[in-house]
Amino acid sequence: GLLGAPAVATYAAAPAVAYSAAPAVSTAYINQAAPVLAHAGPVAVAHAAPYAVHAPAVGASHQAIVRSLGGNQAVSHYSKAVDSAFSSVRKFDTRITNDALLHAPVAVAHAAPVVSTYAAHAPVVSSYAHAPLVSSYAAHAPLVSSYAAHAPLVSSYAAHAPVLSTAYAAHAPVVSSYAAPVVARTAAVGYSPAAVVSHTSFTGLGASYAW
């Protein structure tokens, strides 16, 4: 074979290198994290056990009585206090008694029955009603008027006119003299004049008599 001559290498001048201005470069970074799934456990609720409050109450009382020398008057004092964790109470009581002054109301109350018993005299006034006695005495007037037919009897007693004019309330002649006219009408019987009879009666307040 033929061996070729080695090629002669020629070097050309390297062109000049020109650099242009670098453009503005903006950088943006994006970070993407993987989603995290976290599940919280349930919250445990704790209940405290109830506790008892021990708050005792403290009480105190005081009483004093002061009497006089004779014991008629007395002054009593009474006080009481109660204290607790939530309240405080105080009470005071003072009383004054005097037994000597209690006798005055007794005297006043005793006078009231005396006045009330005085009203019992009212029936005494009502018993004074003697008016019916006077009215019953007026009943004798019809007796006198009913014997007006006995005029002949009056004429025979002319001598006793003063006696008959004062009181003629004689009841006995009424029976004897009144029967004569009744018999005379039924039969013709002649009668002699009646005997002279005189009766006198009087009735007044506290006195009554007749003959």
Swiss-Prot record:
PANTHER family: LARVAL/PUPAL CUTICLE PROTEIN H1C-LIKE PROTEIN-RELATED, MIP24391P. It comes from the Eukaryota. The tetrapeptide (A-A-P-[AV]) repeats found throughout the protein are also present in many proteins constituting the protective envelope of other species. Sequence repeats lie at residues 13-16, 21-24, 33-36, 111-114, 179-182. Component of the cuticle of the pupa of Tenebrio molitor. This is Pupal cuticle protein G1A. The keyword Repeat applies. Keywords: Cuticle, Repeat. One of its GO terms (molecular function) is structural constituent of cuticle. The keyword Transmembrane helix does not apply.
